[in-house]
């Protein structure tokens, strides 16, 4: 998105889970407002403050909004499985017998030590995805299957990477005191020494643990041994939690309480005194029904004692390979109710509010209160109890993480954006493009749509000839069509105009085309029936995506061929994709439970006569170009620091004196990105270079100018996206008048502007790459940034690749709008060429992403070669994000994967996403 999300979720029921509220804090007929990833309002919709009236509105259809679910106790990162132990237990072996036979935790230790960090991440992601699919937004992940320093660190790093791979918050817990590794030969004291003197200091130094845990049980560690670990954790200022009283009562609950632990978990054998101690200390009881069920325990945790004492209770999956291979918090809630006799309210609070409390993050999440993170789960249920009582049923409609609606494994898109034709902002259009959300026209516009349709019906029934209603098309406009043939005329129009060639446009482009067509028709000047509108809306909601070939439009009279293919699917002809399968239009509609529409007078013409394909392609290019432009400022700052360049050219007054807004914004961004760099401070004095080359010194002037024309193109395209562009139009006085709004010249010019900006951003980025690999220009860096030049070629050919991509973009940047050719027997004798002018932007921005990705690799490596000097805090975050995907270059290696990964980090917004808010310039100035 171009800016932080500002969204109002309307027509909802909200379970706030506020602590003192009864009945889950349920509010009927409610609204929830998100701004900058935080909740700013949660209450009755009829009391919604006026200040939020301009925010984007999403109609939740009376669905239930709860806090995002939180799994507060998992061992999600593990290698392999222990299915053989499951078979042993079925034969009667106890937990202790399995452990003493070399199984249990020690078995998982062997597997984890043999796995790489990448292996662990790869194996864990499907388990995490299963949780996410049920509305989970926060997951705690414990180590404890490495049991040596390197393996425990590897496990925790893999856990942290999960939060980079998926849109979910990860809390990591160091569980070194989980079991005694076999190499210790039974010497628990020596192993605890290693935990507190070797593992914990290294983990604390790297900031890898949000908490420290231990397993207090006879088969693991006794209370005095756990106390040593907790004392060490306290010295490192890390909170603690404890596996306690699962198989016997060693008074682990009381021990946890005495240290003010965040939680004590399992607790089957906890007594009333332990429950009271936990309540007094504020230690949460985390109950794990999956383990209780899986190993067929007979002693239940004392839920009644916890209630009586006022101990807070949470629920968690305890996902682990041996005793609870469970990846469903919904099933966990059901188990909590049926096995432990918890109430519905206790179960739901146990995976939201109390789970957040158990992780020490209740001030951030877990309830729907003002100021907290906008982590939400939206459910298609009538009663909250349905979350608890059903088994194997997932009613999740949408998951919202940090204010952004995130896709999940279900294919149906359930959230709907409500569009107000004529005033749909760029932010909403980008959300439709990037997130694939379905849309609907605001019902307030239906009356105008129906009024225009009624007027067209009157004209069709009359005697006067009106273009496209009772005449032929284009050069055949003089031919009168009989009233009985009007429907056939519209159908023939669609079929005859399906002349597209080439590969299908991508789903996100087609969705945007359909949304733009809704906006245009929704203005009430096109004369289509409401049935046409509702079919497009239903196709977007159900996922019926017409197959539109990429080529065939000259950008006037509208995008005829592409939009004819869109309309063909609507009438049961042509082809469409449904859930990824390419089908006939009729079959795709049928599988989605939809029926083809029979087009009435003018409807076929209204659907195909418009600029929506060109505009959608240009908008996609704009959104991609803007993200790349923001990232180019980051990589430009990296390159400047790597080359020990000066930040003096970025001084604010220089840019204020010239006055261009883009230049001012670009200069400010570069200046802020470099702020605090030790590399820069190291050459403030005594640097004999007077000026840097233009590619570093003139970044604000070049990238700022590019930003300005992107913003100009954005204004043009926002207007066009809200325009009525078919022909003829039903005017406010009821007349149907022919005009030329279908001519896409404004879109063609905007596409050319974007192409020029993309070309120039890549050109100056490529010159910075060339500077860094040239030892005569890079101020002390080795040739091609190779650590052993000659033996290694370093980034030599990566720079060549960037040059090739730059040159290709120069060729494609030639203006498309200066071309024209007459068509339709010279009736349509000047055309815009907007469609292919916009379509080329997809390839150009892909090339630009690759160039900037190469600059990221080059700049990051150059900065690393300046060690022990360090770059700024902002740029260090960028390097860390890059290194999470691409290791630093020590020796020559296969480079194509590195370049691909770096380009993806540019394209998906990862690199720009780590920069603090407010530094990088927005598209809407």
From Swiss-Prot:
Its main location: cytoplasm. GO terms for cellular component: cytoplasm. Its cofactor is Zn(2+); Fe(3+). One of its GO terms (molecular function) is imidazolonepropionase activity. One of its GO terms (biological process) is L-histidine catabolic process to glutamate and formamide. N-formimidoyl-L-glutamate binds at residues 145, 320, 322. Catalyzes the hydrolytic cleavage of the carbon-nitrogen bond in imidazolone-5-propanoate to yield N-formimidoyl-L-glutamate. It is the third step in the universal histidine degradation pathway. Residues 1-414 are annotated as: Imidazolonepropionase. In the N-terminal section; belongs to the metallo-dependent hydrolases superfamily. HutI family. It catalyses: 4-imidazolone-5-propanoate + H2O = N-formimidoyl-L-glutamate; L-histidine = trans-urocanate + NH4(+). It comes from the Bacteria. The keyword Cell membrane does not apply. It is found in: Cytoplasm. Residues 415-925 are annotated as: Histidine ammonia-lyase. This is Bifunctional imidazolonepropionase/histidine ammonia-lyase. 4-imidazolone-5-propanoate binds at residues 82, 145, 178, 246, 323. NCBIfam families: hutH, hutI, PRK09367.1. It comes from Brucella melitensis biotype 1 (strain ATCC 23456 / CCUG 17765 / NCTC 10094 / 16M). The keyword Nucleus does not apply. Keywords: Cytoplasm, Histidine metabolism, Hydrolase, Iron, Lyase, Metal-binding, Multifunctional enzyme, Zinc. Pathway: Amino-acid degradation; L-histidine degradation into L-glutamate; N-formimidoyl-L-glutamate from L-histidine: step 1/3; Amino-acid degradation; L-histidine degradation into L-glutamate; N-formimidoyl-L-glutamate from L-histidine: step 3/3. Zn(2+) binds at residues 73, 75, 243, 318. The modification 2,3-didehydroalanine (Ser) is found at residue 557. Its EC number is 3.5.2.7, 4.3.1.3.
């Amino acid at each position: 998105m171009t800016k932080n999300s500002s969204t109002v979720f309307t027509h909802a029921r909200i379970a706030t889970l506020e602590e003192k509220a009864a009945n889950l804090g349920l509010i009927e007929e409610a609204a929830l407002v998100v701004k900058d990833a935080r909740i700013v309002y949660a209450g009755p919709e009829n009391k919604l403050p006026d200040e939020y009236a301009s925010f984007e509105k999403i109609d939740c259809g009376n669905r239930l909004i709860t806090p995002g679910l939180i799994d507060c106790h998992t061992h999600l990162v593990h290698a392999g499985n222990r299915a053989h132990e499951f078979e042993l237990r079925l034969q009667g072996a106890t937990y202790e017998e399995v452990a003493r036979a070399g199984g249990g935790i020690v078995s998982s230790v062997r597997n984890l030590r043999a796995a790489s960090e990448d292996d662990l991440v790869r194996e864990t992601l499907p388990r995490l995805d299963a949780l996410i699919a049920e509305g989970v937004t926060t997951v705690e992940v414990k180590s404890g299957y490495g049991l040596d320093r390197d393996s425990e660190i590897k496990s925790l790093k893999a856990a942290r990477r999960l939060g980079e791979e998926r849109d979910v918050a990860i809390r990591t817990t160091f569980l070194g005191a989980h079991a005694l590794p076999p190499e210790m030969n039974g010497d628990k004291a020596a192993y605890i020494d290693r935990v507190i003197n070797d593992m914990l200091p290294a983990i604390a130094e790297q900031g890898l643990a949000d908490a420290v845990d231990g397993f207090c049980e006879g088969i693991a560690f006794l209370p005095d041994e756990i106390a040593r670990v907790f004392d060490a954790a306290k010295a490192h200022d890390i909170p603690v939690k404890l596996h306690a009283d699962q198989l016997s009562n060693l008074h682990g609950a009381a021990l946890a309480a005495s240290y003010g632990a965040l939680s004590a978990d399992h607790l089957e054998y906890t007594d009333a005194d332990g429950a009271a101690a936990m309540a007094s200390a504020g230690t949460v009881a985390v109950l794990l029904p999956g383990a209780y069920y899986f190993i067929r325990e007979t002693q239940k945790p004392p839920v009644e004692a916890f209630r009586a004492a006022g101990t807070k209770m949470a629920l968690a999956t305890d996902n682990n390979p041996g005793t609870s291979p469970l990846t469903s918090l919904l099933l966990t809630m059901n188990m909590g109710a049926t096995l432990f006799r918890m109430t519905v309210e206790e179960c739901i609070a146990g995976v939201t509010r109390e789970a957040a409390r158990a992780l020490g993050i209740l001030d951030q999440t877990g309830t729907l209160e003002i100021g907290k993170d906008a982590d939400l789960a939206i459910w298609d249920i009538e009663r909250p109890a349905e979350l608890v009582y059903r088994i194997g049923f997932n009613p999740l409609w949408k998951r919202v993480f940090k204010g952004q609606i995130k896709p999940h494994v279900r294919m149906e898109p359930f959230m709907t954006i409500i569009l107000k034709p004529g005033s749909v902002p760029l932010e909403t259009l980008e959300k439709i493009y990037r997130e694939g959300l379905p849309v609907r026209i605001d019902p307030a516009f239906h009356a105008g749509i129906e009024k225009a349709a009624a007027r067209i019906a009157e004209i069709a029934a009359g005697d006067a000839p009106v273009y496209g209603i009772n005449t032929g098309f284009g050069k055949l406009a003089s031919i009168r069509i009989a009233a009985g043939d009007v429907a056939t005329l519209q159908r023939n129009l669609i079929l005859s105009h399906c002349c597209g060639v080439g590969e299908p446009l991508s789903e996100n482009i087609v969705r945007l085309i359909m949304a733009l067509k809704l906006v245009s028709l929704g203005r009430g000047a096109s004369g289509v029936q409401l049935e046409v509108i509702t079919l497009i809306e239903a196709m977007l909601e159900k996922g019926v995506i017409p197959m539109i070939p990429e080529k065939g439009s000259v950008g006037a009279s509208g995008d005829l061929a592409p939009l004819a293919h869109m309309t063909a699917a609507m009438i049961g002809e042509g082809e469409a994709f449904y859930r990824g399968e390419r089908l006939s239009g009729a079959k795709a509609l049928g599988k989605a439970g939809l029926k083809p529409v029979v087009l009435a007078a003018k409807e076929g013409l209204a659907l195909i006569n418009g600029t929506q394909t060109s505009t959608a392609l240009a908008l996609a290019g704009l959104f991609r170009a803007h993200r790349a432009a923001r990232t180019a400022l980051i990589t430009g700052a990296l390159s400047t620091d790597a080359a020990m360049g000066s930040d003096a050219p970025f001084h604010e007054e220089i840019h204020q004196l010239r006055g261009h807004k883009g230049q001012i914004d670009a200069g400010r961004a570069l200046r802020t990105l470099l702020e605090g760099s030790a590399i820069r401070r190291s050459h403030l004095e005594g640097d004999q270079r007077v000026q840097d080359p233009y590619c570093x010194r003139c970044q604000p002037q070049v990238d700022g100018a590019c930003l300005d024309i992107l913003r100009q193109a954005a204004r043009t395209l926002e207007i066009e996206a809200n325009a009525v562009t078919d022909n003829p139009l039903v005017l406010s006085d009821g007349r149907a008048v022919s005009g030329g709004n279908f001519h896409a010249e404004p879109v063609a010019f905007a596409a050319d502007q974007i192409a020029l900006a993309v070309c120039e951003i890549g050109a100056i980025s490529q010159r910075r790459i060339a500077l860094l690999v040239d030892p005569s220009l890079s101020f002390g860096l080795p040739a091609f940034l190779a650590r052993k030049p000659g033996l290694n070629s370093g980034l030599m050919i990566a720079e060549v690749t960037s040059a090739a991509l730059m040159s290709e973009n120069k060729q494609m940047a030639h203006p498309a709008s200066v071309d024209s050719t007459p068509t339709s027997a010279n009736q349509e004798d000047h055309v815009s060429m907007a469609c292919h002018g916009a379509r080329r932007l997809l390839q150009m921005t892909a090339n630009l992403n690759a160039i900037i990705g190469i600059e990221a690799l080059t700049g990051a490596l150059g900065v690393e070669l300046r060690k022990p000097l360090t770059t700024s805090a902002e740029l260090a975050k960028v390097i860390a994000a890059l290194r999470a995907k691409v290791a630093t270059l020590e020796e020559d290696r296969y480079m194509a994967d590195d370049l691909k990964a770096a380009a993806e980090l540019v394209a998906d917004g990862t690199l720009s996403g780590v920069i603090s808010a407010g530094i990088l310039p927005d598209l809407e100035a």
